[in-house]
Structure formats: structure tokens, C-alpha cells
């Protein structure tokens, strides 16, 4: 280890230094608690609609806001549904609700509502489903509402409807506002459940591993201290607008922090226990232990930090907004790992291990146990071990090619949530395209003259769009009457500035299906041709498409680009760091390839379970990216710990023996750390969103595969074939590999 790190280890492990470190962390909590709020206060949810402002759908929305300004914000879709046809009495109740939503007594945050009660009966009849069991009322809320305000407003609507006693009719609220309200409901107590489940699980596992109350509690105290500091720093960031504090990122960050810090505790404690058996001074023992593990911890934590920083290169906000939260967290996790953990355990000393207090032993303990046997197997039969594992992992990886992805947020909600039930009722009772119509904007650089020639061109354009595959209807109907002076134009048809025409089209397919996305893609690709063939000058006029389907097409495009960028950059940066740490390109390349294979096998095996056992038709498109970032970044930790120990043992033993001893000496602590990490991510299985459930399950499988099969057996069996000429010198490994 280099001189500055040795000096730092010596200071932290000294009686005075350990006390200074502990006091500094406690003071940091005190000061931050006084001046900074909790991160939860300023946390926001970017959601699936969080796309870059330069995307076509965002440009369309900007034009829409400029040309057709509105006070309306998020839309709530009130779905009234009965098992039998809606009666006249039911219709009267719905009319009363509509009248209330248009009156002065309506909730203050309701901006406007569809005036069902004012419509002629013939028009009302057209609003019902074919079997007359379902009707939909649109309610627009005030712009700029927070999620809590949306929840309260919809709650007022539900309570009013409940008081009116609508009999056998069932009310479900879906749409953007309904989704926002349900998100609040789903995660109302989720953070507390997540935290206590994580703490409880780690506590139980640590008690089983160490059978020592202090060794079970101290790591949690350390994680709690660091978490409090990180929470307040992120709160400051949110308060001052330094960056977006993403809600979902906070939940996963908490798990990451507790799991990684507990892992660092295990790594340091394993070496500390070894040294306590060699020397009487608890401070000297910690100094030697910390000197041995500080560099691996810095490199392993550094690789995780680099992976998180790489997310800044992502354009899609759902990924980009994870970067600052996790980067800040990793900085303090690293600081806690190399300062707070050794300082606190140095002060507690041997008492931390009670009732199994390590004593100074005259002889070195003989290696034994499960991982010693694994090390022996790897040393004696490396080819067979590596071959069997490679075949297993490659076979599991093949399933990756058959994975199907969903861009429908509703599919991630539990079946019993109101927004999902409302959406599915609409799916069953109305044409699919009506669920989320597409807004078509004809933008002109000059003022539009609504004369006969223009109307004829517009009619031609409307008909051309209607003839395209995948398009069901285009409204309003373009007739010659629109050019008549003082004619009653459809609402929001021509903008006030007369620079835009607004049309609405419905698709033949579900707006979230791949076929619908392909239709929008075709429309975009053929926009100029459509304009030209209809007689419009494509230099003056342009077509823009807005709405959920157009937005999801952009999400798909951004996701594909960001997947390539993040996968490439993370792989390159981590490979460079591994090469620098191991001082060997071959070893670094081997570690990188095995981690990538582990990731592919995890996804493939996960898809088998999700699709063939759990019955999912598709999974969230974000799952592969999230899994890659965390699985690769966290998997590096164990590889670095293993290779560092092998290199250390290679100073005293022949290379094959050094590999076997490295497996034996690190197997117990790394497998324990892996179990804790897998278990903490497994807590996400309790979360209500399907995306978090599948992410937690995937990470749990991936960590266990990486810990026991890849790191525990595959990597060592491959390393056996690397034969340094000067195996007794660490510095010889990178240059002398043959």
C-alpha cells in the first residue's frame, strides 16, 4: 500500500485518531440535523414521462403549450362501471356528479370537467361502451399540483361519490392523476417497511454469522450514522435545487448503503480478527488489518462510484436522476468504510467479538471448512470446474434473446389499484386507441388563413393520415364549412395566434403496444411526404405528434441509446480500474468477462422464472439497465477482495496454492457479505411496484450467482492457469504472466 494510505490507516487506528474520527461523524450529524432537512421532503418522482426536452414528443408538447395555453394540469379519468347495463337512475347520478364537478362546490384543485350533465341525450349515449356498462368522465386538475395535492383532490371526489350512493356502479380513477394518487398510496409506508425490514434482516444474518450481539449491532449503528449524513446532504441538495432527488433512487440508495457498509464491516472484521490473534494491542491489530484492506475497499468502492457517475451520461431522466443520489451516497459510504468502521472497532477492540473473544495464538490456525474444500477443488480440477460453470452460465444466458419489454407503467402497478383497474376496464370496453389519443399539430411559420384552399389541403392531409396502417380515426372531420367566415370552429382547433392546427387521432392498437409505437414512428418518418402530397410547403409547415404513445416511442429510443452508452462506459471504466488495481490486463479482462457472463446468466435465468413460472408476458424496459449498473458495480467488490488476497498469498506460496488459499481465506467473509447484500436487495420483493419486485428478485439471484459460482469457483479456476514466474512478489504478477 502506498505511503499516504499507510499514514491514514495509522492515524485512524490510533487511540487519538479513532476518537477524532468518531467525534467528527457525530458532529456532522448534529450540524446537518440542525441546518438541513431530510431528503424525503424534497424527493420527486420523475416517472416514465421524464424525457429529454429535445425529443420529438417534448417539442410537440412545447408547441402545444405555446399555441394552445391551458390552465388544465394532470387529467383524472373517472371510470363508472357496472356488471349490468347502466340504468337511467345511474345516469342521473352520474349527471349529478358531473354537475358538482362543474360547480363552485367542486374541489378547489379541479380546473375543469367534461360537462356530461349539459350534453344532449344522443351525445351522452355515444359516450357509453357498446354494452352500456361503462362510461368515462374526464376531469382536469389545476396545473403544477404536487402528488399529495392530487391525492387529496381525488380523495375528495371519491368521498363525494361515496356519499351519493351510486348503487352497484363502481368508480375507478385512472389517467395521469390517478396514477400519481395511487403512487402516493402504494408508497405511503413503504420507506419505513423497507428500512425496518432491511435493518431486521441484516441484524438476523449478522447474529447467525457471528453469534455476537455487538458484532450484529455495531455495523447497523455505523450504517445509521452514515445514512443520516447522506440523507441530510441530499436534503440540502433538494432544498437548494442542486439536483433532482429521485424518490425511487432514495429507496434503493438506503438498501445499497446498509448492505455495502455491512460488507465493508465484514471485510475489515475478518482481517481484524486475524490480527488480534497475532498481537495484543487492539490498535496495532486494526492498523495492520486496515493497511491490508484499505486499498481494496477504495478500489471496490471507487468502481461503484464510477458506475454511478456514468449515469450522468444518460439522457433519459429516469437514469440520469439516479446519478447524483447514488454518487453522493457512495462518497460517504467510502468515507465511512475507511474511517468510521475501523475507528469504532478499534475503540471497542476485542469486546466486539464477545462471547468469542479472539486471543493471541502461538500457532497459525490450519485452514479448514467448506471454502477450503472449494479452494482445493479449484486447485486440483480447474479445467473441469471452469468448464461445467461456463456451460451452465452460457446456457442460462441464451434466454436473454427471448426477453420482452413493457413500456406500460400500469403493468407495474398491483392488480387491485384503482388506476390499473380503471385502465383495464377501459381496455375491455372501448377501442384500444381511445385510451390515449395522439395529438397531431400542424405548425406554420406564418399566420394560417383558414380559406377554402387551405381547408382542402387540410382535408387531404387528414385523409392521408387516416389511410395509414394502424390509424383508426382522425378528428375533427375536415369539411368545407370550416372556411366559412365566422363559422363555429371546433374547440382548440385553431390556435389564438393562428400558427397551429390541432387534430386528434386514435390508433387501432393499444397505445402502449409495440404496434402503436411503430405507427407513430411511421407517421414521423413520413411527415414531409404527407405534407407535400397534401399540397403544403414542407419549408413552412411541420407536423408534430404528442401524447402518451409518442412519448413512449421517445422513451424507447432514449432507453436504447442510454443502454449502449451506460453499458459501454461502465465496462470500460471498471476494466481500467481493475487493470490499475490488479496491475494486470489479463486478470482485469478475466474479471470483467466473468462479471458480464454472470450478468447475462442472471437476466436469462430471471426471464425463465418471470415468464415460465410467474407468468409475466414482459418486464420493465428499465430492469436490464438497473441490474447491470448495480450487479456489475457491486460484483467488482468481491472480485477485488479475492484477487487482492491471492496476490498477498502469492508472496509466500506457489501460485496455485496462493489461489486455493485466497479462496479459503476470503470465501467465508465474501459469501457472508454476498448473502447480506442479496438479502437486502431481496427486501425489494416486498415493494408494491412490479418493477421493484422484479429488480429485487433479479439482484438477489445475480448476487448469489456471482458470490458462490462466479467469484467463488469460476474466477479462481481460471486464475489457476495464470503462472507468474515470480509468484512470491506481488509486483511481478502484471509483467510476468505467461
Could you say what each language-model-derived stretch is?
Residues 1-44, 142-403, 536-540, 548-738:
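Membrane-embedded transmembrane helical bundles of large multi-pass transporters/channels
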Residues 22, 74-75, 355, 388, ...:
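Residue-level detector of family-conserved "landmark" positions at structurally sensitive sites
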Residues 27-28, 38-39, 46, 50-55, ...:
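N-terminal cofactor/phosphate-binding cores enriched in small/glycine residues
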Residues 47-48, 85, 318-321, 361-362, ...:
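Short, contiguous strand/loop micro-motifs
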Residues 54-72, 83-177, 402-618, 640:
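Structured non-transmembrane domains adjacent to transmembrane bundles in polytopic membrane proteins
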Residues 76-81:
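Acidic/histidine-rich, surface-exposed loop or edge segments in extracytoplasmic proteins
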Amino acid at each position: 500500500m502506498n505511503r499516504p494510505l499507510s499514514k491514514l490507516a495509522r492515524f485512524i487506528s490510533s487511540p487519538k485518531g479513532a476518537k477524532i474520527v468518531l467525534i467528527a461523524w457525530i458532529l456532522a450529524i448534529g450540524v446537518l440535523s440542525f441546518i438541513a432537512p431530510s431528503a424525503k421532503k424534497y424527493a420527486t418522482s420523475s416517472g416514465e414521462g421524464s424525457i429529454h426536452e429535445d425529443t420529438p414528443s417534448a417539442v410537440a408538447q412545447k408547441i402545444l403549450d405555446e399555441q394552445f395555453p391551458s390552465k388544465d394540469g394532470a387529467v383524472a379519468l373517472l371510470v363508472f362501471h357496472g356488471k349490468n347495463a347502466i340504468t337511467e337512475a345511474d345516469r342521473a347520478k352520474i349527471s349529478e356528479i358531473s354537475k358538482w364537478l362543474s360547480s363552485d362546490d367542486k374541489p378547489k384543485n379541479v380546473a375543469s370537467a367534461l360537462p356530461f350533465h349539459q350534453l344532449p341525450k344522443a351525445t351522452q349515449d355515444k359516450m357509453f361502451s357498446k354494452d352500456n356498462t361503462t362510461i368515462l368522465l374526464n376531469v382536469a386538475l389545476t396545473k403544477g399540483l404536487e402528488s399529495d395535492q392530487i391525492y387529496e383532490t381525488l380523495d375528495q371526489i371519491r368521498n363525494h361519490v361515496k356519499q351519493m350512493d351510486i348503487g352497484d356502479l363502481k368508480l375507478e380513477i385512472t389517467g395521469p392523476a390517478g396514477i400519481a394518487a395511487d403512487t402516493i398510496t402504494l408508497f405511503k409506508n413503504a420507506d419505513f417497511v423497507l428500512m425496518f425490514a432491511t435493518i431486521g434482516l441484516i441484524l438476523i444474518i449478522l447474529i447467525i454469522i457471528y453469534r455476537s450481539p455487538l458484532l450484529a449491532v455495531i455495523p447497523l449503528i455505523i450504517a445509521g450514522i452514515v445514512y443520516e449524513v447522506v440523507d441530510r446532504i441530499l436534503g440540502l441538495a433538494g432544498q437548494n435545487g442542486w439536483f433532482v432527488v429521485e424518490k425511487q433512487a432514495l429507496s434503493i440508495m438506503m438498501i445499497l448503503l446498509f448492505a455495502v457498509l455491512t460488507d465493508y464491516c465484514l471485510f475489515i472484521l475478518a482481517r481484524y480478527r486475524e490480527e488480534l490473534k497475532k498481537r495484543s494491542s487492539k490498535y496495532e491489530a486494526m492498523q495492520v488489518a486496515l493497511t491490508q484492506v484499505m486499498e481494496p475497499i477504495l478500489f471496490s468502492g471507487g468502481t461503484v462510484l464510477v458506475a454511478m457517475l456514468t449515469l450522468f451520461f444518460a439522457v433519459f431522466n429516469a437514469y440520469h436522476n439516479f446519478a447524483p443520489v447514488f454518487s453522493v451516497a457512495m462518497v460517504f459510504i467510502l468515507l465511512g468504510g475507511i474511517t468510521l468502521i475501523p475507528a469504532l472497532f478499534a475503540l471497542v477492540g476485542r469486546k466486539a467479538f464477545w462471547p468469542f473473544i479472539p486471543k493471541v495464538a502461538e500457532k497459525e490456525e490450519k485452514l479448514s471448512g467448506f471454502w477450503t474444500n472449494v479452494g482445493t477443488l479449484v486447485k486440483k480440477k480447474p479445467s473441469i470446474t471452469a468448464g461445467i460453470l461456463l456451460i451452465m452460465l452460457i446456457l442460462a444466458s441464451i434466454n436473454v434473446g427471448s426477453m420482452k419489454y413493457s413500456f406500460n407503467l400500469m403493468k407495474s402497478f398491483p392488480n387491485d389499484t384503482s388506476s390499473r383497474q380503471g385502465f383495464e376496464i377501459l381496455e375491455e370496453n372501448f377501442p384500444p386507441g381511445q385510451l390515449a389519443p395522439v395529438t397531431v399539430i400542424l405548425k406554420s411559420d406564418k399566420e394560417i388563413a383558414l380559406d377554402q384552399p387551405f381547408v382542402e389541403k387540410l382535408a387531404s392531409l387528414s385523409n392521408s393520415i387516416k389511410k395509414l396502417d394502424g390509424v383508426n380515426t382522425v378528428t375533427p372531420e375536415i369539411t368545407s364549412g370550416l372556411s366559412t367566415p365566422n363559422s363555429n370552429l371546433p374547440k382548440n382547433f385553431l390556435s389564438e395566434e393562428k400558427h397551429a392546427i390541432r387534430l386528434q387521432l386514435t390508433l387501432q392498437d393499444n397505445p402502449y403496444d409495440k404496434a402503436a409505437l411503430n405507427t407513430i414512428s411511421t407517421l414521423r418518418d413520413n411527415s414531409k411526404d404527407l405534407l407535400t402530397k397534401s399540397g403544403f410547403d414542407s419549408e413552412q409547415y411541420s407536423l408534430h405528434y404528442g401524447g402518451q404513445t409518442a412519448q413512449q416511442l421517445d422513451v424507447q429510443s432514449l432507453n436504447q441509446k442510454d443502454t449502449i452508452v451506460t453499458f459501454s462506459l461502465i465496462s470500460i471504466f471498471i476494466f481500467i480500474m481493475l487493470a490499475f488495481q490488479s496491475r494486470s490486463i489479463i486478470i482485469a479482462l478475466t474479471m470483467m468477462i466473468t462479471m458480464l457472463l454472470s450478468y447475462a446468466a442472471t437476466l436469462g435465468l430471471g426471464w425463465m422464472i418471470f415468464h415460465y413460472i410467474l407468468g409475466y408476458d414482459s418486464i420493465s424496459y428499465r430492469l436490464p439497465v438497473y441490474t447491470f449498473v448495480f450487479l456489475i458495480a457491486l460484483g467488482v467488490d468481491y472480485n477485488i477482495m479475492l484477487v487482492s488476497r491471492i496476490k498477498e498469498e502469492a508472496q509466500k506460496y506457489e501460485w496455485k496454492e496462493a489461489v486455493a488459499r485466497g479462496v479459503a481465506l476470503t470465501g467465508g467473509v465474501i459469501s457472508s457479505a454476498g448473502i447480506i447484500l442479496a438479502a437486502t436487495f431481496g427486501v425489494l420483493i416486498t415493494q408494491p411496484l412490479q418493477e421493484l419486485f422484479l429488480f429485487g428478485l433479479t439482484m438477489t439471484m445475480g448476487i448469489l450467482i456471482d458470490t458462490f459460482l462466479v467469484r467463488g469457483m469460476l474466477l479462481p479456476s481460471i486464475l489457476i492457469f495464470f503462472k507468474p514466474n515470480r509468484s512470491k512478489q506481488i509486483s511481478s504478477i502484471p509483467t510476468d504472466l505467461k
